Structures are given as C-alpha cells and as structure tokens.
Amino acid sequence: MNLYLLLLVIATSSWQFVAGLECPVECTCDKKGLVVDCSSSGLTRIPKNISRNVRSLVIRNNRIHKLKRSDLEGFNQLETLVLTHNKIKIIEENVLDHLPELKRLSLAHNELVYIPPLCSDSRPLASLNLKRNHIQFIDEQVLRYFPDLTQLDFSHNRIQSLRTKLFDNLPALSHAHLHSNPWHCDCRASKVKALLQKVKWEKKVYCTNPVELRHQALDEVDDSALTCARPAEESWTGEEIKLTCAKNSSSKLVVWMYENVEVDSSSLDGYEIHDTVITVPRKTNVNFMTCTYDFDHIPHHRRLRQSQHQGNGSPQFTYKPRDNSFREGSEVKVNCEVMGNPKPTINWYHNGKRFISSRKRQLGLSNNVLRIYPFLEEDSGRYTCEAVNSVGKVRHAFSLDLISSVPPNIYEGPQSVSQNLGGSVVFVCKANGNPVPDYTWSFDGSTIGHIKGRFMVSDDGTELRISNIEKKDEGYYSCMAGNPVGAMSADAKLTVIGGETRKAAAPQIDEELLRAIAQKARQNVENAVEKTRKQLTQDKVTNTNDLKRLFRFSTPKQAVELSKAREIYEESVRLVREHVEKGLILNVDELHPKNVSYESVLHVTHVQALMGLSGCHTGQYKNPCTDTCFHHRYRSFDGQCNNKNKPMTGVSLMPLRRLLKPVYENGFNTPVGWEKGRLYNGYPLPNVREVSRQLVATENITPHSKLSSMVMQWGQFVDHDLTHTVTALSRHSYATGAFCNRTCENLDPCFNIPLSPNDPRVKSGSAKYPCIEFERSAAVCGSGETSLVFNRVTYREQMNALTSFLDASNVYGSNEVQAQELRDTYNNNGMLRFDITSEAGKEYLPFEKDSNMDCRRNFSEENPIRCFLAGDLRANEQLALAATHTIFIREHNRIAKKLKSMNGNWDGEIIYHETRKIVGAMMQHITYKHWMPIIFGGQAQMNKFVGTYQGYDPDVDASVTNAFATAAFRFGHTIINPSLFRLGNDFMPIKEGHIALHKAFFTPELVLTQGGVDPLLRGLFASPLKHPMPTQLLNMELIEKLFMKGHEVSLDLAVMNIQRSRDHGLPSYTEYRKFCNLPVPVQWEDMKGYIKDDMIIQKLRGLYGVPQNIDLWVGGIVEEKLENGLFGPTFACIIGEQFRKIRDGDRFWYEKDGVFTPEQLREIKKITLARLFCDNGDNIDRIQKDVFMYPGMDKENYGTCQETEMMNLRAWSKCCDNVCPTMLDRILRSRHRGSRLHGCNQNGIWRPEGAKWIPQNEICTECVCQGSRVWCSTKEDCSDNRSPF
C-alpha cells in the first residue's frame, strides 16, 4: 500500500510538472490548458510552449509585429484567437490554414494596411474583427471560405472601396460594421449599400468622395448617384481598343470595371492595363466599360472646405448638426463646421446657457466637434452652435433627445407542469423590452448554464429543456429577463410523478401576487414622494424645516433614484408579509444577518423578482479608468479610479462601510425601538427625547480656556467634505399616506419621536403635533462590486452622497454635473463661478438659480435672496459655514489667477484641475497637521489612534463608516456655542450684535447685509469654543430651537443623532468598546472607570436599564475625554480608524511621493488657515498664527497678517506643460467609456462592468461585460483596451 501511495504521489507530481511546462511564464492558463491568456506580457511573437489543446488564446496588448502561419501550427482545436492591441503590420497569406476549428478571430487595434487571403479552404469562422487598423486594401478572397461568418467589423480604418465580389457567398452574415472609413461612393459602393440593407450595423456609413456626396449616408444615397466614369478617350489600333480614364491630381491607381465588376474578376479576356489606359479586344462592348479610382490623400473634410473659401467673409456653415436621439449612457458626437475669414470662433450652448470643454462635454478641433459621454437625461435638450468673427455671426440650433428605454416585460412565462420520471419538459420565457432583454434561468436559486448536463437553454435564452427527469429535479424554475434598465422574473414549479416524495414546500407565493405587490409598493412610494414634492413647492416653503426637506430634491437625481428603488423593494417585502400567515419574529440575541431569513417566507427566486420589479438592479455609472494620464494626475469628481484595483472604493452614492454588522429588529430593515413595548436585555429602549432632555441638554455652558470656535467650524467643514447621508424623499407613510408628524406610528419612512405628557413643549402648549418628525435615511440597494441580485434578503444600508476622500468635494462637488455648475464657463480661466462681489471686490458664492431651493425664511422680507451655491448642498445651513465656503471660492480664484499669469500657455482646464489639486492638499494639510492634533489632545495621542503616514496602501478601503458618520464624528455637536459671535475690525461686536444660533440657520442674506464674511470669521477665531463637559453637552439652541419657526415643532439635534443611529442599525455603545479592545461594562459599577460623574451613571441607568442598551452616540459623548482632547477613547478609536484609512487609502494624498514635487510640497506645508483668512477676507489684518487656539478678547493678542507665512506659487511655474491629451483642444481626445454600476447578468452570475470570463462548458467562447451587456464574440464594441476582444 505504501509503495502504491508513493507511486501515486510521483505520478501526480510528474503530471503537474508536465502541465506546468505547457503554460508559458508570460501567460495564465486554466487547469486543463484550454484557456490561455498572455495579455500585457511584452511578447513579440506567439509563445511556442502553449498547449496544443488550447481552445481560447488571448494575446492582447503585446508587441507582435508579424503573424506567420508557422506561429499557429498545431492549434487544431483553437476556437477563439484574440490578438488585439499589438503592432501587427503583416499577416502571411492563408495564415488560418492550421486552425481548422477557429470560430472567432480579432486583430483589432493593430497596424495592418493590407489583408491577404486568410485561408485556402473552408473554415467555420463566425466572427472577424479588423477594427481600428490602417487597412486600405482587402483581397477579394478574404471572406471566400467563411460560409458561417455572422459578424464582421471593418470600422475605423482607411478603406475607400471594397472589391465588388468580397461579400458574395456569405449567407450567414447578420452584423457588419463598416463605419468610420473614407468611403468613395462610386459604382463599387452599390454592393456595400446592398449589404447594409440586409444586415444590422452599429453606425451609419458616410461618403467622403465624390465631393457632391460628401457627408451623405450611403444607405440614403440614390442608386443612380453611385456611378463610375465613362472612359475619357477611345482609340482603335488593329484588333484592339485603347480606353483612357481621366484622373485628377489627388487620385492614385485607376480601377477599370467591366459590367460593374473589377476587370480582373470579370468575364473580360485579353486586356492590358498601363496606368490610366486599358487595351481590350476590338470585339469588347465598351459600353460596359467604366473606370474609377481611389485617392492618395484624403484631406479632412473641415480643412478641405475651408480651403475653398476665398477672401474675407462672415461665418457660413459648411456642415450643420441635425436633430438626433441617443440612448442613456451612450457616447454622442456632434460636428458643427464653418468657414469664414477671419477664422470664426465657435461657441456652444445648451438650453441657452454657454458651456466650455470639460470632462463630460469635450470640445475638439477648435470647438468644431462636441463629444458627450455618458449621455444622460440632463444632457438632452436644445443645443446651439454659434460661429463668430469680426465680420459677423451665425447660429444653428438642434435638439439632442434621450431615447426612452423600456424594462423587460415577460408576456409569455413558464407554466407549472407535472411530468413522469425519465420524461422531458420545456419551459418557455419570452419578454419585450428595449434594448432586447437577455435571459437567465435558475433552479431553486442556482443558475443553469446554457448547457448543463440534462439541462439545455436555447441559443436565444427563451427556452429551458430538461431531459431524463429525475426526482431531484422537482422544484421551482425561474426565468429572469434583464436589460440595462431593469429586470423581470417569472417562475414555475416542476412536479415529478413517481419516486420518493419531496419535503412539503413552504407556503406558495406566485408570480401574479409578486407583480401585484411590487406594483402596489411602487405606487405607495411614488405617491408619498409626490405628495411631499407638491407640498414643498417654492410658494409653500415658509420655514427652515420645510427648506431642509426641499434639499432632498436637490440631491443628484441618481441618488434619488437609487434610494427610491430600495424603498420600493423594502415596501414590497413589507407587503409580502401581509400576505403570509407566518411573520418574522426573532429574539434580541438573534439580531444578526446570518440568522435572518425572509427566505422562510420568500423563496430566493421571489427575492430576485422583487429586486427586479422594484428597480434595485440599477446603479451608478462606473468609470473604466482607461484615461490613465488624467487619472494618474487628477481626481475624478465622484472618487472613481482613485484606487486602481478597486475603482469604486470611496465613491459617492455608495453604501457607508460597516465596522460591525447592523442590528435591525427583524434583521432586515426595521430599527431597534420600532416595535413599541419590546424589551432589550430585559428593558425597553428609552424614548430618545427623554434621553435628550434628562441627559444631554444644558442651559449652562463653559467656555474653553484654550481653544477657539474655529475648531468647531473646521470640523463641520471637514464633515461636509466626507459625509452626507441622503434622507428619505417622502414625509408621508408609504403604507397609509399619512403625514409623518401627524402620527407617532412607525410606518416607513416615518420613525417619529413621541412627546411625553411632561415634555416642556407639551406643557407650554407650543407643540402643534404629538411627536417630533423624523424620516429615515434613504436606503441603497447595494454597492455593485459584487452582486446586486442578492441570493437572500439583505439588510438595509445607507448611502453616502459624497466621496469618502478628503478632496474638497464641498468646494467642487461630488459629481461632474455639480462641478460644472460651479465653474465659470464664460471665460476659459479655470475659475469658479460668482455673481456678486463685496465692497472689497472679492467674490461671494454664486446664487442657486436653476431649482426650487429658496433660502427666504420670511417671504415678507425686503430684498430676499436665493441660496448660495457650493460644492455641498448644506453651505447655507448657518452663517459661519457659508463664510467658510466663501473663503474657499476666493482662494481657488486667487490661485487660478496667479497660475494663469505665470503660465500663459495653460488653458482653463489645466488651471482648474491644478488649482483644485492645490486646494484639496490645503484641506488635507490643515486638517491633519493643525486641527486633528487638537481634537485628539496632542500629537502623541493622535499618532496612537491614527498612526503616522507610511505611504499609499491600495488594500485600504477609505470608505466612510456608518459609525463615524452617524455617531462618532457628531461629537462636534457638543462644542457648539448657542450664539455666533460677530466681531468688527476692532474685535468688538458689530452694531447688529452677535446672533442666536437658531436665527442663523438658512439666512444667507445676513452675510451680505450685515458686514460680509469678516465679522463671522473673527467671531470664529476670536471667541472661545464651548467646552464639552459631560454635564454640559448640547446647548438649548440645539435642543429646543433647532430650525425653530414659531408655531411648528422645532427639532432636537440630540434626538436626531440618537434616532439616526437606531435607524442605521448601529450596535450599542458596549459593542463598539469591544470592537476597540476597550473594557466592556457588564454592570453599572464597571463604568466608573471611564465615566467619573456618578450622576451621569445614575441617569444612564434610569434611562437604559443595562449598559448593553446604551446608544453609541450617547455613550461616546459622556465618556471621560482623552487628556486635553474633545472626546473619549471609543470615539477616538472610530475617528482614528476613519482618518487613518482616508489618508492611507488615498492615491492622491498630498504627502504621497509623486503627487507634488518636493518644491511644491514644501510650499503646501506653509499653508495655515490664518493665511487663507488674510488673503481672502475683505479686510482681515490681525489674526493669531494658529486660528484653532484662543488668545483672548484683547485685540493686541492678535498678530498681523504680515507675520503669517505665505505659500509661493512659483513652484507651479511651467510645472505641468506636458499635459494629458484629453485636456487639450485637439482631435486626440480619449473616449471616456463608462458603464452602469449594475454590470451584466450572464447565466445568473452578476459581473461588474469590464469583467471578462470564459463561460463554463463553452470553452470556445470568451465574454466581456460592456455597456451592461454581455458580448461573447471577438467583435469590439468599445475601445476600452481592457476588453479581451
């Protein structure tokens, strides 16, 4: 036995050794050697030691220059060959003779000029891709031996004409892409036109020559216009006739035609050709003889037209764009061409508003070409191309509309059947939709491949056939039809007659009930949202509370739709419970996702169906990060492409990260405290209003002896750069439609806080309604990095609308559209937009003009103004915050002007991105070097919790955590003063005096009418911070007067914080102490080590019963603070973890090698907030060097601005002349291919955009997810060089 085992080990090792030799070191291979990928390996030839059994060979992105027959010898089973993105210039004739089974060939993105015959006998080739080469000539025999060819791509080459017999004998051809070639539309083009009328194509084929047909679509040209020339001269010599063809100076080889076929392929015999002359037998019928030619040089049509223009003249259009429609997410290219002398300048307008070149809307060829990607709803509308010179001006308007896509609708679904053992059955599933849906079949939640044993799915996916039925085949079969805008599922049950009886199934929920439930859920949510929207139209916004609700509709539309989809999904699940006898009741100690299961009620196929019906398959657009130059240098606005390995890390509109798994009452979505009277660890959770009143509220405050109020304000500014949790859009219950604050029932999205009879608001009679209104945070379907079609019900997650990086997104915005709204588009100077300036000539934030947001608190006020517009929607929340935002728009514009003066060759795009990069570095430096050591109580304690910077780590997830955003970083509420100080130049109160906090909310007019930003800034750096004492936590302005308006129930910030943490499913304070490796209290006596005040412990005990019930935010703010710090160890742990990951996981961190030059970094490290105030205040001349430290009230304690160090921008002089091609106004502009976050569903497996794979049991096929569709051929549907095709 031992000898046998030894021989077995030796044999196995030997096999592994031999197998290893069959996979070259430059390649990756599957275990059987059937799939070999040698991409991006620097190869100059095809490796010799590849297994000859290989079925799929990918050698993309290498340096191969020539393809020889000998390179492919022996690959008798090869079905897919991908050689894209090489340097191939030559391929040998009949190169495919050694590949008898080849079905897919891609030679796209090479340097081929001539294509010779590819094989000498018949081959089963189905797909041929020659896209993006330099092809001018294609031999007539190239396609002769491919009767099975279905897909052909000759696009983006230099083809002027094709041989007339090239397309003969191609009975299976269904797709041909011939666009983006300089076609000569002569008699030869009639065969191309005929082909286009038979097959499907991607884009229209346009004529380049002759001039009279230029820019006309070939399929629209009349056949009579597709002609070749009659011979110019005829002469007879004996038995011969000489014919001469006229030829112009730009033409090259003349082509002679006989009966509209090239003479060398025609029935004509005995001819001789000498340049422009052909000699034919005298008996030839010369009436059938014509000639044509191709051109040596094809001048770009724009330059050609301009060369025809003589003398001075006003602009004239030579090509006008036409009205057109495009699908959502597609790339749009529009040409607008003019001539005139002097050369006209072209300007572009969208819905009457001028725009300049940007990442979203790129202008090329001196603004002649407009490219938009991705084309979304906000891009549709009326566009105007305007051409201006000193002689005159012309304008042309046209419309670009969005083609509405239609989600799938299954009109013929599978039917439940019974069948005997050994029999067979066919399930049918057919759906309408636009684009055409793809189909995925599953059995009891497990995906069925196209060919899987006894299971077979038809080629179009509409039929599932099961043969030789066994008892184990009994169960539910589900069909999912999906396209980029939605999905729909239908299922049926197979009952097998005979054999052992299967376990009784759970109560049934059929497809009809699911569809009705989803429709009712959508109606409930949509009605509730619409009611709220109507109530908050501009003429009904009468107070700041309404204003905050209206802000919800100003968040990006994408965020609105993502959160709405999840709400519909959850409402659907709630309605399902109403139809099921068995509810879901779990013990408190079972509140953990892995224990949950709505599957006890909902089958996995039903979960998938509800996800599709609710819209939970959609997601945010995903950037493939192919513009390596730009993404190496600059951040994207939404955070994508920061982490090259995980490009969606830290991106806006993504779920908050979890430190601990959430705790929901039902394990799915309902917060703890949702079910009234429920006990937790033997005690009911306290009413959060009572926690606020008894424990958190304080009428007395103690000023901090060392720190200024700027500590608080910078903290809020940083928070608004990192976190913004989107709230529910509706104030109405989805289930009943009741107004949220009219009832204290917990009905989504309402999670209101009842007021007790002894509440001061009730006793005083000021409470108009019985509870404080609270709407839950909007939920998000999923992250998109894995599957959005979950195999089980997933717990509720909340969305961060901002990027998680410290990147000045509160200045510039967290998406492309928002960023463009903030830019000055009328001048190409890289500056931010402003509308008015102060008396000192310095900019104020621009006014919000294009939405219903309005900051008028009292409509009877004189000169009411609209909201200020900034990168964060909350810029108007209070006056000091608006002043801080103002400083940063001024700083951006100050730097932009200096960079422009030093670098006259820079355009606005370069100036903007370089300035944005500098301002982002300023925020990072001030936060980490000046502010954070203060809040942690010193550099040593900061290093303990945050650590020192060791360089960028791509494995770090910088995403903001739910605990940080919802609880820990809200420690800042304990250091807010009840008033905003406003100090004049003499450091005395201005004549209007200080302002109570509740009067400072959403009042931007006071910035303009009461002294500008200077009094507010002095009030921050020259007033003391509120000391966060455990017995003095939140001042009464925040407890009783938050967003107060006379007759309404004002909010309570402590209540909001505690209720929000429950809404988000945050575990208790003790669980986070355990996470942080801190002592965990079991009894109340255990807490005396870190809560020194016995009275506080007694209050906690009276409210919570046991330490295990304490809410995280409450426990965190009453903890004993770190020495000289502003919070205790639990919050220090959570905040430290977050700021460490924000820094270490940021590829653009300002201290990372290569982000800035050493000289630039030295200058950035000189930056202080004091210097920013000096440079950008209206008249700030005295200030302390460290604005976070409070020197006292005496003006003499403040130094002069001359004493603060300045940053020298000379380090940026000519630093960036070598800019990325995508930032230049040239024809060389990358096409920023993106996609939708939801990716592709293939065989039930969800794959992210850009993923590539070999389907199981289909070795000959190689697939890529592109544009939310699965492409399983060598046809290239985009130029993204990550594609395997």
UniProtKB/Swiss-Prot annotation:
Residues 315-401, 408-495 form the Ig-like C2-type domain. GO terms for molecular function: heme binding; lactoperoxidase activity; metal ion binding; peroxidase activity. The gene is pxn-1. Expressed in the ventral nerve cord, the dorsal nerve cord, head neurons, GABAergic and cholinergic neurons, body wall muscles, vulval muscles, uterine muscles, intestine, the hypodermis and in coelomocytes. It is found in: Secreted, Extracellular space, Extracellular matrix. Residues 508-550 form a coiled coil. It catalyses: L-lysyl-[collagen] + L-methionyl-[collagen] + H2O2 = [collagen]-L-lysyl-N-S-L-methionyl-[collagen] + 2 H2O + H(+); bromide + H2O2 = hypobromite + H2O; L-lysyl-[collagen] + L-methionyl-[collagen] + hypobromite = [collagen]-L-lysyl-N-S-L-methionyl-[collagen] + bromide + H2O + H(+); L-tyrosyl-[protein] + bromide + H2O2 + H(+) = 3-bromo-L-tyrosyl-[protein] + 2 H2O. Ca(2+) binds at D721, T803, F805, D807, S809. GO terms for cellular component: basement membrane; extracellular matrix; extracellular space. The record marks R874 as: Transition state stabilizer. Residues 307-317 have a biased composition (Polar residues). This is Peroxidasin homolog pxn-1. LRR repeats lie at residues 27-49, 50-72, 73-96, 97-120, 122-143, 145-168, 204-227, 998-1022, 1049-1073, 1168-1189. Glycans are attached at N49, N248, N595, N741, N858. Binds 1 Ca(2+) ion per subunit. It comes from the Eukaryota. Its EC number is 1.11.2.-. Residues 21-53 form the LRRNT domain.
